[in-house]
């Protein structure tokens, strides 16, 4: 909004995909029955659930693997305490995104549960990932805003924008971009081709276009 209001950019609509950054789990956690009741956050109150997420560094508690502490400071430890989950769960801070992805692979190989910080859309949407349903976010629910932190994260939009001159200099491209709208599964599949299958961006784009002709043709008709 600030960039648009400063001038030079035009709001060109939103993608269908919504954005979210929060704690969740790979779908195989639910498929293995490691925490019955998920994605409802109250399932985390069950000691038998927490026991399936214990790691050598978690002191006997179930572990949430957060991103680096610089990302959100103590947001997740505060949430655990506010929801009354800190007797059963603890937060470990990862060194970066690569550590989060390595944890997904390690946990599946070891057959143990894992709850990690993640965001959508990204490649994990293609593999299958579910965010925990925490109490809804509302303005003022976080500690820095006067709340107790017993709330999840807000979802958001995935915005499109163009240079203010673009519709005049490239009217056909501008019209196509205006109609373009990707879903979470579309973007997850694209990202998976690069992050999981190891394709170059160019090869991934070609593969996705070949497999999704009905999607992109709707943008150019």
What are these regions, as identified by a protein language model?
Residues 2-65:
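A conserved helix-loop-strand patch within extracytoplasmic ligand-binding domains
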Residues 11-12, 53-57, 88-94, 189-193, ...:
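Surface-exposed patches in mature extracellular/periplasmic domains of secreted proteins
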Residues 15, 34-42, 47-50, 57-58, ...:
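A residue-level marker of the well-folded mature domains of exported/periplasmic proteins
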Residues 21-34, 155-169, 192-193:
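A bilobed periplasmic-binding-protein/Venus flytrap-type ligand-binding module shared by bacterial periplasmic
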Residues 35-38, 70-74, 94-98, 167-171, ...:
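Soluble non-cytosolic domains of exported or imported proteins
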Residues 121-181:
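C-terminal lobe and pocket-closing loops
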Residues 174-221:
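C-terminal functional modules
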């Amino acid at each position: 909004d600030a960039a648009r209001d400063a001038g030079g950019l035009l709001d060109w609509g939103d993608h269908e995909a919504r954005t979210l950054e929060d704690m969740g789990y790979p779908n195989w956690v639910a498929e293995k029955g490691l925490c019955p009741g998920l994605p409802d956050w109250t399932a985390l109150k069950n000691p038998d659930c927490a026991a399936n997420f214990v790691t050598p560094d978690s002191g006997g508690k179930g572990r949430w693997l957060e991103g680096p502490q610089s990302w959100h400071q103590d947001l997740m430890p505060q949430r655990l305490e506010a929801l009354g989950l800190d007797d059963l769960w603890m937060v470990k801070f990862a060194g970066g995104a690569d550590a989060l992805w390595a944890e997904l692979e390690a946990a599946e190989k070891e057959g143990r549960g894992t709850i990690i910080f993640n965001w959508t859309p990204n490649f994990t949407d293609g593999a299958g990932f579910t965010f925990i349903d925490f109490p809804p976010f509302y303005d003022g629910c976080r500690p820095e805003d006067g709340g107790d932190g017993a709330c999840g994260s807000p979802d958001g939009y995935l915005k499109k924008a163009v240079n203010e001159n673009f519709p005049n200099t490239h009217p056909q491209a501008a019209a196509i971009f205006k109609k373009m709208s990707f879903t979470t599964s579309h973007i997850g599949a694209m990202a998976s081709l690069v992050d999981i299958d190891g394709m170059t961006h160019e090869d991934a784009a070609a593969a996705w276009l070949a497999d999704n002709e009905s999607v992109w043709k709707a943008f150019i008709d």
